[in-house]
Amino acid sequence: IQGLLSEFDCQIILTAGPGESEKAHELAAKIDSQNVVVYDKNKGLVDFAHSLACADLFIAGSTGPLHLSSAFNVPTIGFYPNSQSSQPRRWKPINDADKHLAFCPPKGKDEMNLGLISIDDALIEIVPFVRKMWQAGN
Protein backbone atom coordinates (compact mmCIF):
# COMPACT_ATOMS: atom_id res chain seq x y z
CA ILE A 1 0.00 0.00 0.00
CA GLN A 2 2.78 2.40 0.92
CA GLY A 3 4.52 1.57 -2.35
CA LEU A 4 1.42 2.54 -4.31
CA LEU A 5 0.87 5.71 -2.29
CA SER A 6 4.47 6.77 -2.90
CA GLU A 7 4.02 6.41 -6.68
CA PHE A 8 0.43 7.49 -7.27
CA ASP A 9 -2.00 10.12 -6.05
CA CYS A 10 -4.77 7.64 -5.36
CA GLN A 11 -7.33 6.49 -2.84
CA ILE A 12 -6.82 3.07 -1.29
CA ILE A 13 -9.98 1.41 -0.03
CA LEU A 14 -9.49 -1.52 2.33
CA THR A 15 -12.51 -3.80 2.19
CA ALA A 16 -13.51 -5.88 5.17
CA GLY A 17 -16.10 -8.58 5.49
CA PRO A 18 -17.64 -10.00 8.64
CA GLY A 19 -14.99 -10.43 11.33
CA GLU A 20 -12.32 -8.51 9.36
CA SER A 21 -13.15 -4.93 10.28
CA GLU A 22 -10.80 -4.66 13.26
CA LYS A 23 -7.79 -5.87 11.24
CA ALA A 24 -8.62 -3.51 8.36
CA HIS A 25 -8.82 -0.55 10.75
CA GLU A 26 -5.52 -1.58 12.38
CA LEU A 27 -3.86 -1.68 8.97
CA ALA A 28 -5.30 1.71 8.00
CA ALA A 29 -4.04 3.20 11.29
CA LYS A 30 -0.59 1.72 10.71
CA ILE A 31 -0.41 3.30 7.24
CA ASP A 32 -1.67 6.60 8.64
CA SER A 33 -2.69 8.27 5.39
CA GLN A 34 -5.79 10.29 4.56
CA ASN A 35 -5.80 8.42 1.24
CA VAL A 36 -6.58 5.11 2.96
CA VAL A 37 -10.12 4.36 4.10
CA VAL A 38 -11.88 1.22 5.31
CA TYR A 39 -15.08 0.07 3.63
CA ASP A 40 -16.65 -2.36 6.06
CA LYS A 41 -20.28 -1.33 6.17
CA ASN A 42 -21.69 -2.61 2.89
CA LYS A 43 -25.24 -3.89 2.66
CA GLY A 44 -24.42 -7.34 1.35
CA LEU A 45 -23.06 -8.90 -1.81
CA VAL A 46 -24.94 -6.72 -4.31
CA ASP A 47 -23.78 -3.51 -2.61
CA PHE A 48 -20.22 -4.84 -2.41
CA ALA A 49 -20.34 -5.86 -6.09
CA HIS A 50 -21.39 -2.31 -7.00
CA SER A 51 -18.32 -0.95 -5.23
CA LEU A 52 -16.07 -3.43 -7.05
CA ALA A 53 -17.55 -2.45 -10.41
CA CYS A 54 -16.58 1.17 -9.71
CA ALA A 55 -12.97 0.37 -8.79
CA ASP A 56 -10.06 1.41 -11.00
CA LEU A 57 -8.01 -1.54 -9.73
CA PHE A 58 -8.54 -4.43 -7.30
CA ILE A 59 -5.75 -6.17 -5.39
CA ALA A 60 -6.37 -9.31 -3.32
CA GLY A 61 -5.49 -12.87 -2.66
CA SER A 62 -7.16 -15.49 -4.83
CA THR A 63 -10.58 -14.97 -3.31
CA GLY A 64 -14.14 -14.42 -4.44
CA PRO A 65 -13.87 -10.61 -4.55
CA LEU A 66 -10.86 -10.86 -6.90
CA HIS A 67 -12.87 -12.98 -9.30
CA LEU A 68 -15.99 -10.83 -8.94
CA SER A 69 -13.92 -7.73 -9.81
CA SER A 70 -12.59 -9.48 -12.87
CA ALA A 71 -16.14 -10.21 -14.03
CA PHE A 72 -16.52 -6.42 -14.38
CA ASN A 73 -13.21 -6.39 -16.32
CA VAL A 74 -11.61 -4.29 -13.58
CA PRO A 75 -7.80 -4.59 -13.66
CA THR A 76 -6.72 -7.02 -10.95
CA ILE A 77 -3.56 -7.97 -9.10
CA GLY A 78 -3.78 -11.38 -7.44
CA PHE A 79 -1.64 -13.19 -4.91
CA TYR A 80 -1.81 -16.98 -5.13
CA PRO A 81 -0.30 -19.98 -3.35
CA ASN A 82 2.21 -21.81 -5.52
CA SER A 83 0.80 -25.32 -5.17
CA GLN A 84 -0.24 -26.99 -8.41
CA SER A 85 -3.92 -26.78 -7.49
CA SER A 86 -3.81 -23.08 -6.52
CA GLN A 87 -1.65 -21.38 -9.15
CA PRO A 88 -2.95 -18.50 -11.26
CA ARG A 89 -2.57 -20.67 -14.35
CA ARG A 90 -5.55 -22.61 -13.00
CA TRP A 91 -7.44 -19.88 -11.12
CA LYS A 92 -6.74 -16.78 -13.19
CA PRO A 93 -9.63 -14.35 -13.29
CA ILE A 94 -11.83 -13.86 -16.34
CA ASN A 95 -10.99 -10.23 -17.09
CA ASP A 96 -8.94 -9.45 -20.19
CA ALA A 97 -5.56 -11.21 -19.94
CA ASP A 98 -3.66 -7.92 -20.10
CA LYS A 99 -5.66 -6.65 -17.12
CA HIS A 100 -4.34 -9.16 -14.60
CA LEU A 101 -1.04 -9.49 -12.80
CA ALA A 102 -0.32 -12.52 -10.59
CA PHE A 103 2.24 -13.31 -7.90
CA CYS A 104 3.13 -16.55 -6.09
CA PRO A 105 5.66 -17.40 -3.38
CA PRO A 106 8.73 -19.39 -4.43
CA LYS A 107 8.25 -23.12 -5.04
CA GLY A 108 9.17 -25.30 -2.10
CA LYS A 109 7.91 -26.40 1.27
CA ASP A 110 6.38 -22.98 2.03
CA GLU A 111 4.65 -22.54 -1.32
CA MET A 112 1.35 -21.76 0.43
CA ASN A 113 2.88 -18.87 2.43
CA LEU A 114 1.94 -15.67 0.61
CA GLY A 115 4.09 -13.77 3.11
CA LEU A 116 7.13 -15.03 1.20
CA ILE A 117 6.22 -12.92 -1.83
CA SER A 118 8.64 -10.00 -1.91
CA ILE A 119 6.59 -6.82 -1.99
CA ASP A 120 9.62 -4.83 -3.20
CA ASP A 121 10.05 -7.25 -6.11
CA ALA A 122 6.32 -7.25 -6.81
CA LEU A 123 6.24 -3.43 -6.92
CA ILE A 124 8.75 -3.53 -9.78
CA GLU A 125 5.94 -5.10 -11.85
CA ILE A 126 2.96 -3.51 -10.11
CA VAL A 127 3.90 0.15 -10.62
CA PRO A 128 4.22 -0.04 -14.44
CA PHE A 129 1.11 -2.24 -14.61
CA VAL A 130 -0.95 0.30 -12.67
CA ARG A 131 0.48 3.16 -14.73
CA LYS A 132 -0.45 1.33 -17.95
CA MET A 133 -3.97 0.53 -16.73
CA TRP A 134 -4.65 4.09 -15.63
CA GLN A 135 -3.18 5.64 -18.78
CA ALA A 136 -5.40 3.36 -20.86
CA GLY A 137 -8.41 4.42 -18.80
CA ASN A 138 -9.15 0.76 -18.07
Could you say what each language-model-derived stretch is?
Residues 1-77, 81:
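Donor-binding and catalytic core of enzymes assembling or modifying cell-surface/extracellular glycoconjugates
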Residues 22, 133-138:
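Mid-sequence helix-capping/hinge segment at a functional interface
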